[in-house]
């Protein structure tokens, strides 16, 4: 990697970039982590794996709202913060049966992973129906054709609005 390092040092200072960090606790509070130039970023706790869980993010700018779920289950904090947002990017793990087959895991293990620690496509459809985003996107999904179809079918059991399957480098 020597050539890469030398090339970068020709153009950039060796110290790199400074990082400004906002630390916050795990008490479930809502944190305004950034507010500048009309942009407001809020972190809020969502359910993933007790006791650590994860934090979702809500970005607001010029009367537009984007919410990113992080790894989570359906939970009240997500329903509250994503209500009527413009774009909700929410995780949805593959349907348990397909996940078990693709990962060579027992069905019981696959169900725990996809339905206890993560959001199933069916449950993501419930979240979308209850929050009414202008656009919904799911991620954390195998993007194989044999998975996308069943996942969308499960989402459509509860939600008829606009939904996309996220993929790397997707532009919305």
Where are the regions a protein language model picked out?
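Cap/insert and terminal regions of metallo-dependent hydrolase folds
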Residues: 56, 63-65, 73-170
């Amino acid at each position: 990697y020597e050539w890469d390092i030398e090339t970068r040092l020709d153009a950039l200072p060796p110290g790199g970039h400074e990082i400004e960090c906002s630390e916050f606790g795990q008490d479930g509070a809502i944190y305004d982590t950034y507010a500048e130039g009309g942009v407001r970023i809020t972190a809020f706790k969502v359910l993933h794996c007790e006791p650590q869980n994860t934090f979702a993010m809500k970005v607001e700018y010029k009367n537009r709202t984007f919410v990113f779920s992080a790894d989570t289950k359906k939970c009240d904090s997500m329903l509250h913060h994503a209500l009527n947002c413009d774009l909700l990017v929410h995780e949805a793990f593959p349907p348990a049966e397909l996940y078990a087959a693709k990962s060579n895991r027992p069905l019981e293990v696959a169900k725990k992973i996809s339905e206890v620690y993560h959001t199933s496509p069916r449950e993501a459809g419930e979240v979308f129906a209850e929050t009414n985003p202008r656009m919904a996107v799911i991620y954390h999904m195998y993007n194989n054709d044999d998975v996308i179809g069943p996942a969308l079918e499960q989402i459509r059991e509860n939600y008829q609005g606009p939904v996309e399957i996220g993929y790397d480098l997707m532009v919305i």
